[in-house]
A protein has these predicted regions:
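Short Pro-Cys-Gly-centered "Cys-loop" motif that presents a nucleophilic cysteine in a tight turn
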Residues: 1-53, 57-58, 66-161
Length: 161
């Protein structure tokens, strides 16, 4: 049975989730997180995506993204996923898949759901009991979005003025 096509609309934010195969760690060292974020930034720009929020957990990734073209998030995720898997497999002398199938996607059309989704993403490390406050977690957009600190992915925030 063929898989259902994704519903992604131009300029409508989408919540993307990519999990490690069998929930295995996808990030082992700080360098892994750093490389992933650098490549996320690079491929987001290339595809024309705006990354509004993100969190890199040990075994999965959440992104809140929008783009002017419906194909752009898929292009970004394909390029990013391939490059990161090659890096990870080479670095840790392994082979095979890193990710658990296709990434999942969910449209976030309503503004109240959009803000709830951003909070959900940025509070993930707190819910996982990794930190007490989201600002303590290095691998999320919380500090950039909530506190104006650090480096936004590409200058677009969901924060209300």
């Amino acid at each position: 049975m063929p898989r259902r096509p994704r519903l992604i609309l131009p300029n409508v934010p989408v919540h993307l989730i990519q999990r490690g195969n069998n929930r295995q760690p996808c990030f082992v060292a700080d360098e892994d997180y750093s490389f992933y974020l650098d490549w996320l930034r690079e491929y987001a720009v290339q595809a024309g995506c705006h990354v509004h929020a993100y969190v890199l957990m040990t075994n999965h990734v959440h992104l809140l993204v929008s783009a002017g073209r419906a194909e752009a998030p898929g292009e970004m995720m394909k390029a990013l996923g391939q490059r990161y898997v090659q890096y990870f497999n080479r670095t840790y002398r392994r082979s095979g898949t890193l990710w658990e199938g296709r990434y999942r996607s969910c449209l976030t059309q309503a503004e109240d759901y959009l803000l709830a989704c951003q909070r959900y993403i940025e509070l993930n490390p707190v819910r996982a009991a990794m930190v007490a406050h989201p600002a303590e977690y290095r691998w999320s957009s919380y500090r950039a979005n909530a506190q104006g600190q650090g480096n936004r992915m590409n200058g677009h925030s969901m924060r209300r003025s």
